[in-house]
């Protein structure tokens, strides 16, 4: 690969954080978390040694650990030094893996190390609903605290706790979870607890196991072997990427994070492994993201294909198609399995730092979001451009979707931001309908497929004509959020990316100018809109918007600015290179569900595009 014209530095992620600074109001800050997973579920691991979120056995199961949503009622699995005075913490992943290491440091020396993982291997269909935690002391003896308190059905189902020869087992009518350890632990009310003195340079495993009724010796779980298998699995997967370009460490960390979010039994991906982490502290914008969104399909395929995972991208599309076929309709959101249990309910938790309500399930499943139809057609087109085969099954599906868009595009909807107000004629949804016809026509022509191209082109032209007439406001010289509105919408950043209008067109430049003036904060972060959406309170800056902005800058050939913005947002990643959905532009704190697939898809999409543009410019200069 040619050398890029500028030294694009890799980001140095991890650094020490004072133990007492990790929590605010009794809750670890969202950014002070890592996560581990096994392609069925994932656990958040805070820098203070707490696993404070985790659903077992699957992403969409009830959370066994949920203290991130209620520090008193929620469950957790904690290991930390008993005396945290003047203790600092570092946290990092073993290179090119999702094996997480947390180190507690005092007076410049490591005093305690935790290595956390969930077993995974190339034999993906073999499930290990287990959390393995390796505890190591160093040159001095150390007192540690172990505190294990799982909860069931968000505290509604009270477990029986029984001592086993090799640990303890929590059992309800429907579920069970055990903890196996060689440390001396005891029952303390509704939890298992231990203050343990570790001798210098000693170590031991603690394992949480879901769905068991009998425990074996800790050594029988072969944690060292499982750790090696898991390490090999992640490194083998990472090494199969073809990407070796700029910001490699950030791109690969995003890819590894994304890979965890796939649910292996069906191949579908959750938008995030968490529920109800707030978009504003104390606010009500708290949603469950443990589902698959149709509109994410195209992003996933484009991103994975761009760094060499074409097989995974194609497989994801077919898995998504399989789910749609079984359901016999296109819905906004799908469960990752066949449960179809998306009903939204409120649980009696105080919420992260008092952010209520705490929602489980997602009501957006019932909305009409017309842009999703364009997303699935563009996903198939993206797969085709990456070398995938559009067979008769896929093409028949495309024609069915296009027939639906032919009449749906004129309807009001809730659009990309899933407004819970009355449906409107959102410009973004119209443009996505236009983009669907654009992709379908291109596939028909490029692949020699039978299609009513003339009819499609006529409808596509009609959509564009209407959007230019009703969706562009001459007074403000910009496209607007919906017909008849003066409001601006950051989703309009995608107009050039979708090919609806050139990036240097005066109409888009006017739109971009308004977005920069009215929605941009801190020079590179963006609010989604200023429209009253019927919800109380504000929200943070939506990180995916920054990556769309960078794509626009690349299309406008403003490469220096694109690079500056990209490096600025990369510096906003946490100590592990992870992102949430949003960020508080004032404090820098993460907001929303974490880690967020869309944010990481943005990293993966933009870095290769910027490098390619820089290489082309250099080649042109040198020719």
Curated annotation (Swiss-Prot):
Keywords, ordered alphabetically: Carbohydrate metabolism, Glycosidase, Hydrolase
EC numbers: 3.2.1.28
Catalyzed reactions per annotation: alpha,alpha-trehalose + H2O = alpha-D-glucose + beta-D-glucose
InterPro entries: 6-hairpin_glycosidase_sf, 6hp_glycosidase-like_sf, GH15-like, Trehalase-like_N
pH dependence, record text: Optimum pH is 3.7. Active within a narrow range of acidic pH values (pH 3.3 to 4.0).
Pfam families: Glyco_hydro_15 (PF00723), TREH_N (PF19291)
PANTHER family given in the database record: GLUCAN 1,4-ALPHA-GLUCOSIDASE, TREHALASE
Name by which UniProt lists this protein: Trehalase
Species: Thermoplasma volcanium (strain ATCC 51530 / DSM 4299 / JCM 9571 / NBRC 15438 / GSS1)
């Amino acid at each position: 690969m040619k050398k890029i014209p500028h030294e694009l530095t890799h980001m140095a992620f991890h650094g020490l954080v004072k133990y007492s600074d990790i929590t605010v109001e009794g809750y670890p800050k969202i950014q002070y978390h890592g996560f581990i997973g096994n392609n069925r579920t994932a656990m958040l691991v805070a820098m203070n040694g707490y696993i404070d979120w985790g659903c077992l056995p699957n992403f969409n199961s009830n959370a066994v650990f949920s203290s991130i949503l209620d520090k008193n009622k929620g469950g957790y699995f904690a290991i930390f030094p008993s005396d945290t005075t003047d203790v600092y913490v570092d946290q990092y992943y073993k290179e090119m893996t999702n094996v997480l290491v947390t180190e507690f440091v005092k007076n410049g020396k490591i005093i305690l190390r935790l290595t956390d993982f969930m077993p995974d291997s190339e034999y993906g269909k073999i499930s290990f609903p287990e959390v393995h935690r390796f505890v190591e002391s160093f040159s001095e003896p150390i007192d540690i605290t172990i505190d294990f308190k799982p909860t069931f059905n968000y505290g509604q189902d009270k477990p029986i706790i029984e001592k086993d020869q090799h640990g303890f087992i929590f059992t309800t009518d429907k579920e069970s979870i055990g903890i196996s350890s060689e440390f001396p632990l005891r029952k303390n009310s509704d939890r298992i607890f231990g203050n343990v003195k570790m001798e210098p340079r000693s170590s031991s495993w603690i394992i949480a196991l879901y769905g068991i009724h009998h425990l074996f010796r800790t050594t029988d779980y072969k944690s060292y072997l499982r750790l090696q298998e898991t390490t090999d699995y992640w490194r083998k997967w990472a090494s199969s990427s073809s990407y070796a370009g700029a910001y490699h460490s950030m791109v690969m960390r995003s890819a590894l994070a994304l890979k965890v979010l796939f649910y292996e039994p069906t191949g579908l991906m959750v938008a995030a492994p968490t529920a109800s982490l707030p978009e504003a502290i104390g606010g009500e914008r708290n949603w469950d993201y443990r589902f698959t969104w149709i509109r994410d399909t195209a992003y996933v395929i484009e991103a994975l294909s761009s760094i060499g995972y074409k097989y995974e991208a194609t497989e994801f599309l077919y898995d998504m198609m399989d789910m749609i076929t079984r359901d016999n309709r296109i819905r906004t959101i799908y469960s990752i399995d066949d449960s179809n249990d998306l009903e939204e309910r409120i649980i009696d938790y105080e919420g992260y730092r008092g952010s209520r309500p705490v929602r489980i399930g997602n009501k957006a499943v019932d909305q009409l979001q017309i842009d999703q139809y364009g997303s699935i057609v563009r996903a198939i087109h993206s797969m085709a451009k990456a070398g995938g085969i559009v067979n008769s099954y896929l093409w028949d599906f495309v024609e069915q979707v296009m027939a639906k868009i032919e009449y749906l595009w004129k309807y009001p909807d809730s659009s990309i931001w899933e407004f819970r107000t009355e449906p409107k004629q959102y410009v973004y949804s119209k443009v996505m309908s236009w983009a669907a016809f654009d992709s379908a026509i291109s596939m028909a022509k490029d692949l020699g497929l039978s299609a009513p191209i003339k009819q499609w082109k006529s409808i596509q032209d009609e959509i564009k004509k209407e959007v230019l007439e009703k969706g562009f406001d001459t007074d403000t010289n910009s496209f607007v959020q919906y017909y008849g509105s003066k409001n601006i919408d950051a989703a309009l950043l995608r107009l050039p990316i979708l090919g609806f209008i050139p990036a240097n067109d005066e109409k888009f430049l006017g739109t971009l100018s308004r977005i920069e003036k009215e929605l941009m904060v801190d020079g590179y972060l963006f609010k989604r809109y200023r429209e009253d959406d019927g919800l109380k309170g504000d929200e943070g800056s939506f990180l995916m918007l920054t990556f769309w902005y960078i794509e626009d800058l690349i299309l406008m050939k403003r490469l220096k600015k694109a690079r500056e913005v990209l490096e600025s947002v990369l510096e906003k990643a946490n100590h592990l290179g992870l992102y949430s959905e949003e960020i508080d532009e004032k404090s820098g704190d993460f907001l929303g569900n974490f880690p967020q697939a869309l944010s990481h898809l943005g990293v993966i999409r933009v870095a290769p595009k910027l490098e390619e543009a820089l290489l082309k410019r250099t080649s042109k200069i040198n020719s």
